[in-house]
Amino acid sequence: MPSQKWSTKFQVAGYGGLENMKHMVVKHFPENIERFVEPFGGLGRITDLVKADEYFINDKSDYAYNFLKNKFPNYVVENMDYIDFLKEYATPNSFVFCDPPWRKNIYKNHERPAFTEKNVITYYEKLLELLPKLHCEWIITSDRDEHENGHRLQKSGYPNITMERKTGTGKFFGRNPAVRLCSNIWRNQNDWG
């Protein structure tokens, strides 16, 4: 039986942190994107805001996959393991946006999780290992303090920024919506958009 906990339903439906932060997040994307590659497409909320020459979107959930196919009929939409998807579609002229699962409760409290890794930490470890080998530009997201992924982004050696939306959205889990971004795009603070 699916969880009846409000916080878990909220996480499965889409954590409001990224949903309410998306306009701030895309300001940190490269200006000219040839290939936009999104291995954790969800419902395409970020994709809606991206201008690119080509789009490649993936989600392992059957619901999200079908939703994306209908919403973006002219984009390449896949239902693959995220690693296989990245190896197939990420090229040196790609910008890869990764928003992997942030919360452990999704695993514990969701009836049929459409996840390919045993836990949240593994997503971050594998992404940080693979993305540099693909020679593309990328951003990975997480919750602001990374308490559930063991601070993998902060420890990665790549620049991190944390953004918080202070007005107009209400609180999520008792705090303002916020997101951490980690990327190979930024060299110094002046590059942070």
Where is each model-derived feature located?
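Class I S-adenosyl-L-methionine-dependent methyltransferase catalytic core
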Residues: 1-193
